[in-house]
Amino acid sequence: MKESTVIHFPFSVRRGVWLSKYSTFRIGGPANYFKEVHSTSEAQRVIQFLYSHNYPFIIVGKGSNCLFDDQGFDGFVLYNSIQGKEFLSDTTIKAYSGMSFSFLGKTLASSGYSGLEFAVGIPGSVGGAIFMNAGTGKQDTASVVESVEVINSKGEILSYRNEELEFGYRKSRFQNHNEFILSATFRISKNSSSLQIAKDLLESRLLSQPYQQPSVGCIFRNPPGNCAGKLIDEAGLKGVSLGGAQISLKHANFIVNTGRATSHEVKELIRMVQDKLRSQGISLEEEIRIIPYRLP
């Protein structure tokens, strides 16, 4: 189906919603159609309809890893607000995908549960953490995931075990399969030191990352055996600006929005960094999702 086709949805939708409001970068034009879902049944209905009508769509959680286009998105944006968690046992907890990953980690650590302390300070959703296999230099989401529930194109709920999720460094099967991540079950354990561990990790992040400015976290994946931020800094690019976009002075693998940055400016900075490092024989792969105005 072409994006310009007039379509009548059997559920309420919003039009012209500015995606800058749903991105931690504060960048992005209006979505053609926008729908926020709050329940499993609602998500099933929307997903099934979109697939059956072959309508282009993207799924968004907290928007903490997305660079939206200045023109917006000529398709359907499905915004995931499915919240909630439940203990399945003393060693497992199920969390729904729209929940804040950082809040989940903080809640568990405050209750004396270990396993997700590293999540504190990661600004995305549970679903986003699964999608990107979010983590730190020492631990990632894959290390504590037991299983993940998804909604497929028919609106059915399926479950994948950890070994079926194709986890890799900042990668998962969901980057190649457009399934709706519904929930994840995590392995946890009791630990009286968990809250202090979480506090220490958060303090370290606050000291080293530009949390006070709009960004979408690390722009590039670290090359094997090296750190992208260190390489960018050594290339003399820290602090370089283009319009309202700037390579962070605090952490060179972050690009921050200093006021009125556009997606074009951010993408040009990304190209500048890649070209500079490529001239030194180093290839940098983007970690963020760059969402085009139209899907290919």
From Swiss-Prot:
State the organism of origin. Answer: Chlamydia caviae (strain ATCC VR-813 / DSM 19441 / 03DC25 / GPIC)
Pathway in which the depicted protein is active: Cell wall biogenesis; peptidoglycan biosynthesis
HAMAP family given in the database record: MurB
Q: What are the catalytic residues? A: R170, C218, E287
InterPro entries xrefs: FAD-bd_PCMH (IPR016166), FAD-bd_PCMH-like_sf (IPR036318), FAD-bd_PCMH_sub1 (IPR016167), FAD-bd_PCMH_sub2 (IPR016169), MurB (IPR003170), MurB_C (IPR011601), MurB_C_sf (IPR036635), Oxid_FAD_bind_N (IPR006094)
Name the residues that span the membrane.
Answer: none
At the top of the EC hierarchy, this enzyme's class is oxidoreductase
| Catalysed reactions listed for this entry | UDP-N-acetyl-alpha-D-muramate + NADP(+) = UDP-N-acetyl-3-O-(1-carboxyvinyl)-alpha-D-glucosamine + NADPH + H(+)
Protein's gene? murB
Compartment list: Cytoplasm
The record's keywords, sorted A to Z, are: Cell cycle, Cell division, Cell shape, Cell wall biogenesis/degradation, Cytoplasm, FAD, Flavoprotein, NADP, Oxidoreductase, Peptidoglycan synthesis
Q: Which named protein is this?
A: UDP-N-acetylenolpyruvoylglucosamine reductase
Q: Which E.C. number(s) belong to this protein?
A: 1.3.1.98
Q: Which GO terms describe its molecular function?
A: FAD binding; UDP-N-acetylmuramate dehydrogenase activity
Q: Which family does it belong to?
A: Belongs to the MurB family.
Which Gene Ontology cellular-component terms appear in the entry? cytosol
Q: Which GO terms describe its biological process?
A: cell division; cell wall organization; peptidoglycan biosynthetic process; regulation of cell shape
Write down a Pfam family by its short name. Answer: MurB_C
Q: What is its main location?
A: cytoplasm
What residues does the FAD-binding PCMH-type domain cover? Answer: 26-191
Role noted for this protein: Cell wall formation.
